[in-house]
Amino acid sequence: MRVCVATIVHHPEDARIMHRQIRALLDAGHEVTYVAPFSHFNVTPAAGLTAVDVPYDAAYGRARTALKRGVKGADLVIAHEHRLLRVLPYRRPPVVWDVREEVSDGRRARALRRHHVITPATMPEATQVAAAPPPPGDTRVVHLGRLTADNGVRELIGLAERLVPYGIRMDLIGAAGPGVRPLLRDAQRVGLLDWFGHVPHRHALRMTQGALAGLSLTRPPGGTPTKILDYMGRGLPVVTTSPGAPLVEPAGCGLTVPLDVNGILDAVLDLREDPLRRLALGRRGHAHALAHHHWPDHAAAFVARMEDWAGVPVVTHSLAV
């Protein structure tokens, strides 16, 4: 099977796209053409796939041109933005829309009339769960993933400043939007935090281990942040704003706070003062992630579903995940 996977806004090394979906397809012996903004993010395409470069947030014309190249000879298209559904070539294979953003029921229903649709309800979000992560420490907090104003960058910087007197440092692991990069550089220059930029996914996950807490400060009413699963899979207590509550509260693995520096600070300091609570929250999150969100448990089903939608006979795969 030949699959065209396309995004115009996500980092080419996006964990869901590259390290779970594409890797599972490649490990199952399928061919992948990846349409993504490689040049914008200064990323060299991974070995084993065919790359088609596209400008970041490309206009319709340029996105259509890139997608037309990508779908040539493909048996299936996996699109990661709704905008890409508007620039599909007339002659094309079956299309899968992997819903990554908040969308209305009407838009989803319209897409279902023409295409296949993946949502968290049909295919659970997942992560690579560590076998035996170290217990949470008490000297640093971490934020994993893209840094933008909507992801609470200003609050993260404000929190980092308030944590300095307590000897707690902040590690930010992920690329940043152009509008917040100067703020992050200034904060790093004066020693408030450590910003590592984009880090390869497996290494980034290891970097989170042993932190006091994983932070998710998405501005309401944003979608449920999948970084929370990464924290859970590494045994970290989670401090999240309300968009993360649907993951954190059922698992009993963290604290829900308002998008307010004082409230976030209180939550972090409460966790620091209670190592037994930190350990219990981390263990509950890890157990929940292992039971429900461990990618190796879902990879074969994902590949089989793509084969079915492409009209390729389903075979049994042993996936190296």
PLM feature segments, named:
Residues 52, 96, 102-105, 110-136, ...:
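Donor nucleotide-sugar binding/catalytic pocket of nucleotide-sugar-dependent glycosyltransferases
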Residues 251-262, 270-276:
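Conserved acidic donor-binding segment of nucleotide-sugar-dependent glycosyltransferases
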Residues 4-6, 123, 133-161, 171:
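Conserved donor-binding/catalytic core segment of Leloir-type glycosyltransferases
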Residues 4-62, 70, 175-179:
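N-terminal strand-loop element at the rim of the active site
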Residues 181-205:
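Nucleotide-activated donor-binding/catalytic signature segment of Leloir-type glycosyltransferases, i.e.
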